[in-house]
Amino acid sequence: MLQSNRFAIYAIGKIKKHWIRDGINQYKKRMPELIINELKTFNLNNLRSNNNIIIVLSEEGKQFNSIELCSLLLNFKNKKINFLIGDTDGISSDIKENSDLILSLSPLTFPHELARLILIEQIYRAVSISSNSPYHRS
């Protein structure tokens, strides 16, 4: 079963749109252990360890449906799963090359703030799927 304390989101910049912030806060109430850090730059040295997985969000990444994403996250066993979200300029190629996975949320393009909200919802959904919660309906 997935635990929300295994996840951290590192994102460049602050959320400016109040309705996105409100949505994120709703999921934070459901998963208070989820770590969300707003940064100016990424430092992979701080995140890289034997017990950390680094997943970069990028439009050219691999796409999964919700069940597949849950299964993937379960396969990481007891490792800490760190998601990196860039700003409007995306994430540099060297960070992508040093990540464990490049993930795309959709073939559609989203503003980076909205991508943050969608990712948090998908983490919540994966946690719910893994615990057989009625939140996800196939």
From Swiss-Prot:
Q: Which residues cross the membrane?
A: none
Keyword DNA damage among UniProt keywords: no
Q: Which residues form a coiled coil?
A: none
Catalytic activity, reaction form: pseudouridine(1915) in 23S rRNA + S-adenosyl-L-methionine = N(3)-methylpseudouridine(1915) in 23S rRNA + S-adenosyl-L-homocysteine + H(+)
Gene Ontology molecular function terms on file: rRNA (pseudouridine-N3-)-methyltransferase activity
Which InterPro entries has this protein been placed in?
A: Alpha/beta_knot_MTases, RlmH-like, tRNA_m1G_MTases_N
Q: Look up the record and report any one GO term of the cellular component aspect.
A: cytoplasm
Q: Which EC number applies?
A: 2.1.1.177
Top EC class of this enzyme:
transferase
Q: Where in the cell is it found?
A: Cytoplasm
Q: Which keywords fit this entry according to its UniProt record? A: Cytoplasm, Methyltransferase, rRNA processing, S-adenosyl-L-methionine, Transferase
Instruction: List ligand-binding residues for S-adenosyl-L-methionine.
Output: G86, L105, S106, P107, L108, T109, F110
Family of the protein in this entry: Belongs to the RNA methyltransferase RlmH family.
Partners and quaternary state?
Homodimer.
This chain's function reads:
Specifically methylates the pseudouridine at position 1915 (m3Psi1915) in 23S rRNA.
Against HAMAP family, the record matches this protein to:
23SrRNA_methyltr_H (MF_00658)
Name the UniProt record assigns to this protein? Ribosomal RNA large subunit methyltransferase H
- Gene name tied to this protein: rlmH
